[in-house]
Amino acid sequence: MLPYWCPLLLAALVLQYATIDAVNYCNLPCRGDRFHVGCGESAFAQECGESPETLDLLKEHTDEILSKINDVRDHVAKGSWGLPMAARMKVVVWDEELARLATRHTKGCLAETHACRNTERFLFPGQLNFEYTDDKLPQTKELIDAAIKKGHLQKHNISREIIESYRDNGPDGNVEELALALSDRVTAVGCGLTTWQDGAKARALLTCNFSSQNTWGRPVYKIGNSPGEKCIEKDETYKNLCSASEPIDPNESN
């Protein structure tokens, strides 16, 4: 006999996919004359060269992404790297809608398109892109690890001043990727991956959409005197973070 929660989980997944399919992204507001990445047909762009392919991210890949993001959030929340402790930073979960829109973005084979990516739930989503070019592409897990390592190296650039008043570059370099992973308004993430052949080179674009983004001049996260002091409930695995059920509004600014 299946556990009692299996039908409930299945129903929740069906509802989430049904909600994604029901959204008309062409009707969502976009600033200026920009288009929404979810509007129209999902086809590869001309920039994708030869043999473009969207690769499925398996559970082992999504688990890896979530584990790395939550590891660094937990590490920083307790005051590591000389950064202040976080009062109410929660565990990040996977979101299929963000992942679907990230996948649509990668099918353009350009990191920066300035397309809208907002949803009915996430009004100001953030986005990170990782481009890879080589003679041969590595396995998906190695691509993910390389992208995460790039963001992790920004720990040498980030500072308390940037946490208190965000800007994407510090005196020692870029902090955009790491600062987005540390935002306490980020509650969910979803990623997509497309590969293609560009002449003799193999190329890949990994895109991750986050439920919120940092705002210039605003705090990356609220500072506390102890890790998670404002959490209703702490997470059992990441003990310096709030649990996944913490009611944080990703659309609210600090």
Curated annotation (Swiss-Prot):
Expressed in salivary glands. One of its GO terms (molecular function) is toxin activity. Pfam families: CAP (PF00188). CDD domains: CAP_euk. Its main location: secreted. GO terms for cellular component: extracellular region. It is found in: Secreted. Residues 66-210 form the SCP domain. Belongs to the CRISP family. Inhibits platelet aggregation induced by all agonists tested (ADP, arachidonic acid, the thromboxane A2 analog U46619, thrombin, and snake venom snaclecs (TMVA that activates platelet through GPIB, and stejnulxin that specifically acts through GPVI (GP6))). May act by competing with fibrinogen for binding to glycoprotein IIb/IIIa (ITGA2B/ITGB3). This is Tabinhibitin 6.
